[in-house]
């Protein structure tokens, strides 16, 4: 099923009980975030705040707050059907000619869909019924959300930023967060490898100092929105892909003030330019990691025109500790990634980006292993094949029999099949998300690969081992006794599947270096010395038996190379890795550490008192 615009999609969701209209007045400053966060974590509906305090424009949040709604937006009934979308993209990335008449017939549905890819250009559009220009331009009239108490300013989040590089026919659509700094200015935070930033770079090289035209569309139809967050091939425009998803051509209209084409289905459009010489400090903001990011300088977008429908809807979201809407999108798009990766690496059985790993910082891959060292080839492939994974810090590779989406199964494979030292790969000074405060410097850090596949004879020979589980003897293992080994230990969790070879240790850290102090005390215990392979050390704010908490701590509080302690094995001691997933003190790091997002107790109490009245769940 396809949808011509956002309102068509909302009507469909409402009929299915997947949209809740909130008529009670709600403040876009913080209150909408608290309500949206509770709703998303409960798997609840999209929310339409019809009476935002101080504004006449309703606010839509949590539109893609479940993977099922993402699938609906892509014209699918079930999340598993998104693999078909991935198959299309894999085909478009590397098309193969038909091998015969039957194969041509099999490919016919794809060819028919491809015919819907070119855009349809219109002269008029509802998104230009109202036009503000010059002094009329005023972002203060739009209910831009303030999400967290320590955010520096209101934040625009769901705009489709439309750019075109010089001498390029294809436009680029991207979604970048945008800090409001004046009634006609926002900061455009885009990473250097993203399409909009690349278009600006090319423009600055060809037209030094000249304004770079930009348009930003809010509230387009779901296929166009989701097309902007999907890994489409570089040769394919997001508008064309949206047409493929929708089954009909994407309708566009020329911007009121520049030559960029905007989606006819949009609710609100910002138009203007970026002065290549104008920068401003962006942030800090509470981000999808669950922390506030550092300040960074980014280009300023000056708005000369705002166009909109009559009685428009403002589409917004928040980001915070997962799960949030970006994490949910990651879960759904995970199904799109699988066929694309399998096209290049047919040996891959499954691929999983756990949402607790901030959508992309950790990947688990299962594969049909075919030769010694095969797992390392797959690791390299994940890091290099799609630019979406250039910031992935951890890649765990397991055999096809392992359930990539079950942490107990993955940990069991790690403990049974790995020599922690020899089967781990570290690569330093690689591209890392600039929001990753655990990296030594902004944008540059390390990656880690873990080969948890069953080892072949050649691999064991190289390791000088006869089995990969030689230290898994049945020596007594008393968790309560281990807790008493060091006064900083507050809890220890040993997964039942790990036979004592994997443990999570919670400590009450008060100064630098205490992780090493604790594990060195544990290593003096004979059972730990001989049997244990992996220890994860976390702070007291992490639940030791909750994999979501554990993986979140590992992916946000570690630089793999710096924060992994290594012990080579010997006849009396098993090889060991310690993941120091604690918050770091200034003596342990070289840059400012992230500040965790914390909710305002007064705001929580206020929403508690009104919760039943909202009737959301």
Swiss-Prot record:
Pathway: Cofactor biosynthesis; ubiquinone biosynthesis. Keywords: Cell membrane, Decarboxylase, Lyase, Membrane, Ubiquinone biosynthesis. It is an enzyme of class 4 (lyase). The keyword Cell membrane applies. One of its GO terms (molecular function) is 3-octaprenyl-4-hydroxybenzoate carboxy-lyase activity. One of its GO terms (biological process) is ubiquinone biosynthetic process. InterPro entries: UbiD, UbiD-like_C, UbiD-like_N, UbiD_Rift_dom. The keyword Metal-binding does not apply. Its EC number is 4.1.1.-. Residues 460-588 are annotated as: Unknown insert. Its cofactor is a divalent metal cation. Signal peptide: none annotated. It is a peripheral membrane protein. One of its GO terms (cellular component) is plasma membrane. It is found in: Cell membrane. It comes from the Bacteria. Belongs to the UbiD family. Homohexamer. Catalyzes the decarboxylation of 3-octaprenyl-4-hydroxy benzoate to 2-octaprenylphenol. This is 3-octaprenyl-4-hydroxybenzoate carboxy-lyase. It comes from Vibrio vulnificus (strain YJ016). The lineage of its organism: Bacteria, Pseudomonadati, Pseudomonadota, Gammaproteobacteria, Vibrionales.
